[in-house]
Amino acid sequence: MIPSSLRRLFCLSLLVPMQALAGNTSASSQPALSQELAGRIETLKKKAISDLVFVEGGRFQMGDFGPIHSEEKLPYTSQPENKPLHWVELDSFSLSRHKVTYEDFDVFTDANNKLRIAMAPNDKPYREVPNVPAGLNWPEAKAYCKWLGKLTGLPFDLPTEAQWEYSARNRGQMVLWPTDNGMWEEGRNIAAYDQRKELLPTVKFFSPVTVPLAIFPPSPLGLYDMTGNGSDWVEDWFSEKYYEVSPEKNPRGPVRGKTKVFRGVESDRETGLTFYRQHTEPQKKIRYRDSGEVFTDRWPNIGARCAVQSGRAESP
């Protein structure tokens, strides 16, 4: 019989070469992984710049313009927070043509050694179809846009609420819906219920809240999915009375608040209006009713598109 001390020595003699081999394998594969990630980062960098739409600044009346536009000279909505109609003047800026997708955001999380988002069972169906807008909480949206700024050397950030509405209204015109013709036409420029199920068949038990991007025509400015396909976070804190005190020049919302504004909507005519305001907690924790366990801290239907806070057009 082999003494126990010799058995331990024999096992250790086998273990050391095996550990060395595993270490060498990992080391040899790491450069390939880094090279692959570097390629994805470079591709995203080029995409982020080429995706920009330059929006020339100007002056417009922000808010529910029904009293000066509708036949009855009445507001289009009963919402108090999108009133009063007030003048706003904006400097020029650029806005992303498309929303951030899960593929885009995966590059950000991988590059920063973070866990990928939306890996829960309820979220995964949206990942299984390419080019679907990512559901993000506000801190994630903000961090992603600022990271693009570090990546490109450009002042990327979230758009302000005023910038978003000005863009949705084709530089402040009296446009009701930010579609190709200013109309809400389900099946032609907005996804109808049956189309949503067809475009995202991985979602089995309910109508998808988002669908792949750029299925329908862009707005006259060249912006896709400003309504009818999820919402966009903006920079501003929310205040119901902000329009009463908003500065005219480049407003950025209240200094502080409890909820953040998001604009656009997935499938509703009224909330899809260019001037309709919505807000929610920046990082809402959604819990299981029975256990109280948090299963997500983001809404699948609120995402982001980034802006470049610069007065000149950017090119790749």
Kindly give the residue locations of the regions a language model identified.
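Functional-site microenvironments in short loops/helix caps that host divalent-cation chemistry
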Residues: V55, Q61, G66-S70, N122-D123, ...
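Extended beta-strand/loop cores of jelly-roll/beta-sandwich
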Residues: I2-L6, C11, A20-A162, R171, ...
